[in-house]
Amino acid sequence: MQQQKLLSLIRQAIEDYNMIEEGDKIAVGVSGGKDSLALLHAMKILNRFYPKNFELYAITCNVGFEGMDFTGVRKFCESINVPYEQVDTEIAKIVFEDNKDERPCSLCAKLRKGAMYKRLGELGINKIAYAHNKDDFIETALMSLIYEGRFYAFPPVTYLPEAGVTVIRPMMYVPEKGVACLLYTS
């Protein structure tokens, strides 16, 4: 799949769901994986010619596992001239040592998002973009149907009033197989 087609799919999702408004400050939630880096790269390209002006940032939550190193993410952000924020936490200690929750992934995700949303508020950033792709939406809907008996997937846009942040998912039309193309054709 060509990069132009993928950028077109991202732009289409943004327009279909009014994900970007004039003057938005948008942070891409970056894990260091291909999906989030591809989204950051695509948003940087779109930022140059999109008709609505917006500021772009990248944010990572370091949950505190030993050996985690986000130097590569920081360098990538520098190379495309996107301000980068790393939120350092002790979430791993809380989840795995202090709490020993039976569902550590769920608790970790909640704490990680909470830490990022808090920092976004401090920085005056009003939106966070996650790199959930088309396959993620389909898998989530099917798992919800199988395990919960209901058909549910992530909403494309979600306002979180307690955090004052809007979550957007611009890659919702991009198939998994096309994600790497955004990085490797640049």
Residue locations for each model-derived region?
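Short, flexible loop segments at boundaries between secondary-structure elements
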Residues: 153-174
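Conserved small/polar residues in nucleotide/adenosyl-binding loops
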Residues: 184-185
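ATP-dependent adenylation/nucleotidyltransferase module used to activate substrates
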Residues: 1-142, 147-150, 155, 177-178
